[in-house]
Every structure is written in C-alpha cells, then in structure tokens.
C-alpha cells in the first residue's frame, strides 16, 4: 500500500513583528484584553516585497532542504491560501515560478483556516492514486492585507506567514504503525457562510474587501465541529485520543484550542501551541506549528500526529499522520 510520508518541513515569517503593546497604539485595545481572550501576544506582518507567494516559496525551499531534495524532484505543488498574490494565476503557480520549476503541476486550495488540512488530504489522494510521487504542500497567507484595521475585534487576531511539507510516496504494509497519512475527514456547511467571510471579491464588488466575523458564533460551533470530525478519524483508524502523541490544531485562539483538547481528553502537554507567537495565520498556522515542534524536537519519527482545523464556510477537518 502506498502511503504519503513527510520528508521535510519548513516555514517563513515576515520581518516585522507586531506586539500587542504596539497594537495598542494602532487601535483601541490592550495587551491584557487580547491575551485574556485569545492568548495572542504578537504576530508577524508582511511588509513591502513580502507576499503570500514569496513567503510560500521561502518555506518550500526550507522544506526541500530538510528533505534533501531539489525543486526538480517535485512533481506537484498545492498551496492552501485565501490571500493569493493575484486573482489568477494561483499562488501555487507563482511559487512554482519562484522555485524555477517548469515541470509538474500546481494549484491552490481555498478552505480558509482549514485549507492546510484540505491540501494535505488532496495531496495524499493524488499520491495514493499514483498521480504524484513527491508533493510540496504549502499553507501561506498575508491576512494583514484583508483586515479592517479599524475593527479591533478582528485586526488583533491575525498574522502572516507560511509553512510547507514535502510528502513522498512510500510503499508499505498499510498498518497504523507505518509512517504517513493514515486517515483524513473533511466537512463543510455553507449555511454558516455569513459568520466568517470577506465582504468583497471580483464577482461582487470588484474589490478585495475586508474580513468580517461573528466571533461568538464561530466559537459556539468550533469545538463541537472539531471534536466530531476527529472522532470520525479515530473511528476510521481504530485509534483513540490516548494514542495521539501530538495534537497540532489550527491556531485560531487559545480558548478554542483548550476547549477542543478538553473535549477530546487530550492533555495540553500534548498540544502544540504557537498562537501566542504567530496569531491566527489561517491556512499557514498548522504547518508553522509543525515546523516549530519539529525544530525543537517534540515531533519525532514514529509519533502519531493529529491535525485539526475549522475555518470560514464553515469548513472543518482532521487528519491523522504517523510521522
């Protein structure tokens, strides 16, 4: 049985760090207010010359280096983003160009904060189906460019960045002990589309628009939806919460992260948390968190890693991965 095995990880952050103290000078808020409600202490903001594609390409090159591979070894790029450099071509094609690749194929997946789980699931399907052997899976965002910087309820939450993984097809016995993606479950429910959205687009306003969110509504649904899809992944794999070595959640805010871990009975010692340092980077948050946990030695070969996310739409999903 073919499995999609992680060969390397990488990440990239903009140069500018925006602390809560500096945020106090930009909008009517306070460090205490932000930390108590979200757990966020700082975030990174893209500056001139820094784009979704430039950050994504930087993360991709680091992932390739970690894998001991070159762009020539990759035959597919999939980028999860809601903030591409252009309406078209895709961020993935822009990244492909930055990597000097003229072979293979590249495309974007847009599922907002769940985007990286959707992208990993899609890449795994291509690998299992024999359509790709080595895939760059990237989550990259510049959400700072769609924020309403007068809206203190949203502008304090988000940051920019990118993370990337290299997935490679490996033949194995197909047991739960084998390395690679074990199972993934995706969901969406468009009846909630107006609870977290951007109020613009080429087909409606002809403008980029700004992010709008009903925070209480998002929080009300988040923990239950996340827990439900994770339970589906456990049922499909025969694994349980006790088997999980590391939970890597979408870094939305600390309350949602803590609530999901508690509902699943996963101790916080097993949860990778970077929201305090990165803020909510949407589709980039999971690969950024993975990169941190791999670099500091927490995630090791053989570990069972659980990814989960929820985003606008609503979209949500979970993926179990043997590292």
UniProtKB/Swiss-Prot annotation:
It is an enzyme of class 2 (transferase). Pathway: Lipid metabolism; fatty acid biosynthesis. Keywords: Acyltransferase, Cytoplasm, Fatty acid biosynthesis, Fatty acid metabolism, Lipid biosynthesis, Lipid metabolism, Multifunctional enzyme, Transferase. It is found in: Cytoplasm. GO terms for cellular component: cytoplasm. Residues 251-255 are annotated as: ACP-binding. Pfam families: ACP_syn_III, ACP_syn_III_C. Its EC number is 2.3.1.180. It catalyses: malonyl-[ACP] + acetyl-CoA + H(+) = 3-oxobutanoyl-[ACP] + CO2 + CoA. Its main location: cytoplasm. It comes from the Bacteria. One of its GO terms (molecular function) is beta-ketoacyl-acyl-carrier-protein synthase III activity. One of its GO terms (biological process) is fatty acid biosynthetic process. The active site is at 113, 250, 280. Catalyzes the condensation reaction of fatty acid synthesis by the addition to an acyl acceptor of two carbons from malonyl-ACP. Catalyzes the first condensation reaction which initiates fatty acid synthesis and may therefore play a role in governing the total rate of fatty acid production. Possesses both acetoacetyl-ACP synthase and acetyl transacylase activities. Its substrate specificity determines the biosynthesis of branched-chain and/or straight-chain of fatty acids. The last Arg residue of the ACP-binding site is essential for the weak association between ACP/AcpP and FabH. Homodimer. Belongs to the thiolase-like superfamily. FabH family. This is Beta-ketoacyl-[acyl-carrier-protein] synthase III.
């Amino acid at each position: 049985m073919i499995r999609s095995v992680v060969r390397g990880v990488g990440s990239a952050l903009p140069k500018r760090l925006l602390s809560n103290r500096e945020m106090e000078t930009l909008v009517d808020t306070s460090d205490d207010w932000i930390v108590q409600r979200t757990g966020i202490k700082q975030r990174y903001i893209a500056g001139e010359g820094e784009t979704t594609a430039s950050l994504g390409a930087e993360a991709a090159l680091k992932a390739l280096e970690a894998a001991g591979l070159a762009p020539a070894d990759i035959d597919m790029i999939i980028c999860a983003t809601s903030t591409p450099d252009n309406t078209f071509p895709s961020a993935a094609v822009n990244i492909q160009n930055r990597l000097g690749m003229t072979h293979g194929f590249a495309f974007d997946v847009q599922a907002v904060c769940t985007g990286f789980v959707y992208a990993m699931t899609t890449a795994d399907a291509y690998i299992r189906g024999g359509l790709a052997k080595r895939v760059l899976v990237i989550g990259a965002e510049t959400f700072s460019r769609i924020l309403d910087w007068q809206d203190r309820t949203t502008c304090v939450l988000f940051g920019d960045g990118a993370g990337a993984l290299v997935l490679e097809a490996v033949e194995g016995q197909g047991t739960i002990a084998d390395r690679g993606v074990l199972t993934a479950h995706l969901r969406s429910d468009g009846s909630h589309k107006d609870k977290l959205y951007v109020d613009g687009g080429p087909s409606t306003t002809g403008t980029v628009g700004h992010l709008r969110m009903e925070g209480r509504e998002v929080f009300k649904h988040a923990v239950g939806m996340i827990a439900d899809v994770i339970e589906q992944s456990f049922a499909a794999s025969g694994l349980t919460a006790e088997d999980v070595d590391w939970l890597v959640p979408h870094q939305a805010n600390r309350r949602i992260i803590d609530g999901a871990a508690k509902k699943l009975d996963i101790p916080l010692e097993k949860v990778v948390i970077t929201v305090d340092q990165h803020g909510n980077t949407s589709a980039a948050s999971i690969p950024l968190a993975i990169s941190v946990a791999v670099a500091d030695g927490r995630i090791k070969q053989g570990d069972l890693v659980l990814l989960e996310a929820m985003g606008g739409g609503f979209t949500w999903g979970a993926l179990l991965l043997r590292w």
